[in-house]
Curated annotation (Swiss-Prot):
<dbReference type="GO" id="GO:0046933">
    <property type="term" value="F:proton-transporting ATP synthase activity, rotational mechanism"/>
</dbReference>
<keyword id="KW-0066">ATP synthesis</keyword>
<dbReference type="InterPro" id="IPR050059">
    <property type="entry name" value="ATP_synthase_B_chain"/>
</dbReference>
<comment type="subunit">
    <text>F-type ATPases have 2 components, F(1) - the catalytic core - and F(0) - the membrane proton channel. F(1) has five subunits: alpha(3), beta(3), gamma(1), delta(1), epsilon(1). F(0) has three main subunits: a(1), b(2) and c(10-14). The alpha and beta chains form an alternating ring which encloses part of the gamma chain. F(1) is attached to F(0) by a central stalk formed by the gamma and epsilon chains, while a peripheral stalk is formed by the delta and b chains.</text>
</comment>
<dbReference type="InterPro" id="IPR002146">
    <property type="entry name" value="ATP_synth_b/b'su_bac/chlpt"/>
</dbReference>
<keyword id="KW-0406">Ion transport</keyword>
<dbReference type="GO" id="GO:0005886">
    <property type="term" value="C:plasma membrane"/>
</dbReference>
<keyword id="KW-1003">Cell membrane</keyword>
<dbReference type="InterPro" id="IPR028987">
    <property type="entry name" value="ATP_synth_B-like_membr_sf"/>
</dbReference>
<dbReference type="GO" id="GO:0046961">
    <property type="term" value="F:proton-transporting ATPase activity, rotational mechanism"/>
</dbReference>
<comment type="similarity">
    <text>Belongs to the ATPase B chain family.</text>
</comment>
<dbReference type="InterPro" id="IPR005864">
    <property type="entry name" value="ATP_synth_F0_bsu_bac"/>
</dbReference>
<keyword id="KW-0813">Transport</keyword>
<keyword id="KW-0472">Membrane</keyword>
<keyword id="KW-0138">CF(0)</keyword>
<comment type="function">
    <text>F(1)F(0) ATP synthase produces ATP from ADP in the presence of a proton or sodium gradient. F-type ATPases consist of two structural domains, F(1) containing the extramembraneous catalytic core and F(0) containing the membrane proton channel, linked together by a central stalk and a peripheral stalk. During catalysis, ATP synthesis in the catalytic domain of F(1) is coupled via a rotary mechanism of the central stalk subunits to proton translocation.</text>
</comment>
<comment type="function">
    <text>Component of the F(0) channel, it forms part of the peripheral stalk, linking F(1) to F(0).</text>
</comment>
Amino acid sequence: MLVAAFAAAGEEVEGNPTYPILPHLGELIVGIIFAIIIYAVIAKKVVPRLEAMYEERRAAIEGNVEKAEKAQAEAQVALEQYKAQLADARGEANRIREEARQQGAQILAEMREQAQAESERITTAARATIEAERVQATAQLRAEVGRLATDLAGRIVGESLQDSARQSGVVDRFLADLERSESGASSR
């Protein structure tokens, strides 16, 4: 139906019907030539630029992907190094802690030894001082008892015991008798 409408609208030129939407042969040839020229210009100028832009974009995307993969690999290596360093640091901290604990125990043991030695030294010195004071007190007591005994014995006996040898013999005999009487009284 459409063809019939075109045929009715067209005029007949030299026995051929003309169609209004069909171009003339000259126009058709000029159109084909311009189409070929436009195609050639596009193929020579535009397409290479588009291809270059496409290639640049593809290379940039691939480069970015490679960079991202490389960065991820580096991050993984850094993470492994960090974990290794962290493990080393923990091991070092444990070693230092254990070393400090051992040093503390050693210092404590040394301090105990020093305190024990000081205690023994003080105890020994105190015992020596006490013994020296006891010996001195005993000597003073013997001398005092001897002097008193000599005075009393001299009064009782009526003779003078001023001679030191005699005095010493009397004192020793008196103390021996006194010790015997005390030991006899304590055994009862």
